[in-house]
Swiss-Prot record:
GO biological process: protein quality control for misfolded or incompletely synthesized proteins
Alphabetical list of SUPFAM superfamilies matching this protein: ClpP/crotonase (SSF52096)
EC number: 3.4.21.92
Record-given protein name: ATP-dependent Clp protease proteolytic subunit 3
């Protein structure tokens, strides 16, 4: 039986009364965001809105983005990526569990020096996926060109974020490329492996 979203007590500043709020709302008050599912438009819109709000409240404080995601939509992920680059706040990215595909891309997109993973995390990079259902050949050709354009753009960005050469990124992302937390650090996708919150 699913447990649903847990609720936790929260006292508004200056108030004597506590009220129960969902845990994600409570974490958001502490500038902690969580990407714990497949990346889609709804998740992206929610994270973008939260980052913009937190940045407008106080851009001198970091935003913490915890990632445990198998990846998902490239366009939705790029909306999150662009927002990470856009906000003035530092964005600390923390991998807990799995950061695969777009999840790994977003992990690497955090503020340099602030990209971390817990010791048993797994990170996976690969090329973008695309489908060709029963469609006209010209439509398939258009989609293939767009996928190849996205692949090059993502690989160039991964090269910039990791310090690896474009050719190495292109070779490594040709198929699923799994890394441990330490391997991801050596590769340049993250900056540190941590085991305590104070290390982030």
């Amino acid at each position: 039986m699913p447990i649903g979203t847990p609720s936790v007590p929260y006292r508004l500043p200056g108030s004597q009364m506590e009220r129960w709020v969902d845990i994600y709302t409570r974490l958001g008050v502490e500038r902690i965001l969580f990407l714990g599912s497949e990346v889609n438009d709804g998740i992206a819109n929610s994270l973008v809105a939260q980052m913009l709000y937190l940045d407008s409240e106080d851009s001198s404080k970091p935003i913490y983005l915890y990632i445990n995601s198998p990846g998902g939509s490239v366009t939705a992920g790029l909306a999150i990526y662009d927002t990470i680059q856009y906000v003035k706040s530092e964005v600390v990215t923390i991998c807990v569990g799995l950061a695969a595909s777009m999840g790994a891309f977003l992990l690497a997109a955090g503020t340099k020096g602030k990209r971390v993973a817990l010791p048993h995390s797994r990170i996976m990079i690969h090329q973008p996926l695309g489908g060709t259902s029963r469609r006209q050949a010209s439509d398939i050709e258009i989609e293939a060109r767009e996928i190849l354009r996205m692949k090059e753009m993502l690989n160039r960005s991964l090269s910039d974020m990791s310090g690896q050469s474009f050719d190495k990124i292109e070779k490594d992302t040709d198929r699923d490329y799994f890394l441990s937390a330490e391997e991801a650090k050596d590769y340049g996708l993250i900056d540190r492996v941590i085991s305590h919150p104070n290390e982030a």
